[in-house]
Every structure is written in structure tokens, then in C-alpha cells.
Amino acid sequence: MKQDSRFPNLFITDHPLIQHKLTHMRDKDTSTRTFRELLREITLLMGYEITRNLPITTKRVETPLVAVDAPVIAGKKLAIVPVLRAGIGMSDGLLDLVPSARVGHIGVYRAEDHRPVEYLVRLPDLEDRIFILCDPMVATGYSAVHAVDVLKRRNVPAANIMFVALVAAPEGVQVFQDAHPDVKLFVASLDSHLNEHAYIVPGLGDAGDRLFGTKN
């Protein structure tokens, strides 16, 4: 994992397998089915990185031979919250890794000025829970900021929030950092820039359309 000196809260997971799979996702000729499978696989691989610092305690267990104090995740419970709609494609990968996690949903769409409009919030109980927000793209950054706002307004501490995306534009990362410098943002790639239509370049295209096989 590496960082960019411009963005202290940004962490880039540069594992070769992740980069290999991301290249195939970028390919405009990749089928909907393959795109969906790759999104799930990359999210699973990124999950290992973003959960590496979860607090650990010990639990007494009986093996077939002896009793031993073995490591387990301490206390806090996990919740996966995809930002609809494209974030749904990432939640399965994280659930493969942590099948006991609760799942919430935050629904937003982009208005003509690219600002997020909220239409749905469904969350599990908040107490002592670590939230992993997921959305394949951080383009303008407004939807990501809004998703974190939803949790902070409900008194979820910043230390209990992580945001994971596949690709991000520097413009969006700056917006996210300005709004939430205390929340970690994990991505597989920091791309070049946003174009005049607020699409990430080189990016993936419209992740939701490619994931579900729809046309914008």
C-alpha cells in the first residue's frame, strides 16, 4: 500500500493482482459478466488491506490437542454500506471476506450540477460498529462526502468509518479530504483527472451501467 503526499488520508492498494484485474475492468470490451466478477474479486482483495488494522484480542479455545489463547477481532462489529447503485457490486466481495457483517445502504444520485441527491438510507444499529462505505468511483467526491456525512450525523466516530473505491480523481480526493480529513479513503488507483462531464480519466466509464448492463 502506498500514499500520495498531497492527500494524507488516501491509501492506494497497489498489489499486482489488483492492478492486473483493474486493467481488465478498464477495457471497454470487457463484458458485463466479467466486469461484475472482477469488481467482486478486486473488492475482496482490497478488503484484506483495509481490514489489516482491525483491533485484536484473544479468546480461549480448545484445539484437538491443547487449550490456547488465540487472536480474534476485538469487540467492534463490521457493517458494509454500499453507495447505490454501483456500490452494490462491491458489497458481495466484502461479504465473502466477512460473511457475518451487517449490510446497510445509502442511495444517492447525481443532479445536473453533480451534487448528490439522497433518496434512501438504511443502516444497522450503530453502536460499537466499524463501517466500510463502498463505491467504485470517487469522481467529484460529493457522493463520498455525503455518505460519510450520513454516518457522522448519526454520531458514528470518524475512526469507525472507512471508504473504499476502485478509482478516484485527484479533484474528488481533494473534496473528500477537505470535508473529512479524519476518514481514511482506500483506492486501487488514483487516476489523472476529471473531464468536462465529470468522468474520471482514464477511469472505467460509468461503473453502474457497466455493472448492470444498462445505458445512460
From Swiss-Prot:
- Name the needed cofactors: Mg(2+)
Tell me which residues bind uracil.
I200, G205, D206, A207
Q: How is its activity regulated?
A: Allosterically activated by GTP.
Q: Which CDD domains would you find in this protein's record?
A: PRTases_typeI
**Which reactions fall under this protein's catalytic activity?**
UMP + diphosphate = 5-phospho-alpha-D-ribose 1-diphosphate + uracil
Q: In which pathway does it act?
A: Pyrimidine metabolism; UMP biosynthesis via salvage pathway; UMP from uracil: step 1/1
Q: What is one GO biological process annotated to this record?
A: UMP salvage
**Pfam families (UniProt xref):** UPRTase
- Family of the protein in this entry: Belongs to the UPRTase family.
Which PANTHER family does this UniProt record tie to the protein?
ADENINE PHOSPHORIBOSYLTRANSFERASE (PTHR32315), URACIL PHOSPHORIBOSYLTRANSFERASE, CHLOROPLASTIC (PTHR32315:SF4)
Q: What is this protein called?
A: Uracil phosphoribosyltransferase
